[in-house]
């Protein structure tokens, strides 16, 4: 990505992108001219796998035209077709009598086409937004693709020269929002709180033995910071060595002792759950309660001396000896789906502004004000806030009532007076009687208030 060391090459982008567009338009115009000059005599189209026959015209009828004839649902879900067993764009005209099969995302052909096309779009977006350099690589949507020599990545490639420096850089912290699968019994599944496929804010810290206590305290502080923003109270549990553990007892004892020290220093009450740790190490679980007082384990910190040894991970210590690091598994939110379900009930649909999916709505008083209302919506949206618009001919009372029921945090009323002054009249979700409505505000002042609420998690 573009940064201070690798800035985006604006001159290159400004020259090559218009050239690409121009070339595309020239080829498109040439193809359209050729299509118009070719004969459009009737053809027979055999639909697979059913063998149903449809009529069409050469160089005119496309697979999408046939899909529309069959059903709107098929046309909407279609991604690619096969003409005489060769993949064919849905909008490309058919050239003669042929067999035709249409594929959606539920097929390998449809998925591979979607992933291939979306990868090109993603590449173009990354190039224009961050200045990434596009290169030719294998189209392997079902494979990992990590088959390049490390030298290909330049400074980013990991090689032997990096290993002596790793000790000096410990702890190394890595995090990702990863998709996980768990084979839950059907009877254990419940809404979004317990599912078989979920996203987790997975993080791993690699550190020296003497760094474990401070790193665990750092994760605990981070969890406390996030949960205080949400307004959660939580319980801390230390789970110790289970019967099916791996590793020696001395290592387990040290790991449990490190977590106990970190919890004591953290200063909040905690309890021990004997024998409930992971097979590879002890763990701290953080439990929160929803609006119905049901308890859910969300955040976790798991200490792992075993897996680094199993994978033979080593670093060169300051004693010039190869030693195994300690790995700390952690998650702050845990399952994103479960956390979202808890937040839904916790806030009862009345989201704070910084987290709200309906931060504001612009309500115009009349058709004459619609243009200014759209301008206000665009100005707020461009800064990054969620804002809708109500241009219907209903009464203002009805619009405001519906907006509060929705519920939008801010209701921005626009009439002739606001058009003339370049302002908006602000009504608040929390004040149905209108006693605490704000005075007219400029868009700049309103955005300042939005920013204040966002940065302060209000």
Curated annotation (Swiss-Prot):
Q: What is this protein called?
A: Probable threonine--tRNA ligase, cytoplasmic
**PANTHER family in the record, alphabetically?**
THREONINE--TRNA LIGASE (PTHR11451:SF46), THREONINE-TRNA LIGASE (PTHR11451)
Recorded catalytic reaction(s): these are: tRNA(Thr) + L-threonine + ATP = L-threonyl-tRNA(Thr) + AMP + diphosphate + H(+)
Q: One GO CC annotation, please?
A: cytoplasm
Name residues in a coiled coil.
Answer: none
Q: Which UniProt keywords apply?
A: Aminoacyl-tRNA synthetase, ATP-binding, Cytoplasm, Ligase, Nucleotide-binding, Protein biosynthesis
Report the subcellular localization: Cytoplasm
Q: Which Pfam families match?
A: HGTP_anticodon, TGS, tRNA-synt_2b
Organism, scientific name: Arabidopsis thaliana
**Predominant subcellular localization, coarse grouping:** cytoplasm
The record's similarity note reads: Belongs to the class-II aminoacyl-tRNA synthetase family.
Its EC number(s): 6.1.1.3
A GO BP term here is:
threonyl-tRNA aminoacylation
Where in the numbering of this chain does the TGS domain appear? 41-104
Q: Name one GO molecular function term.
A: ATP binding
Top-level lineage group: Eukaryota
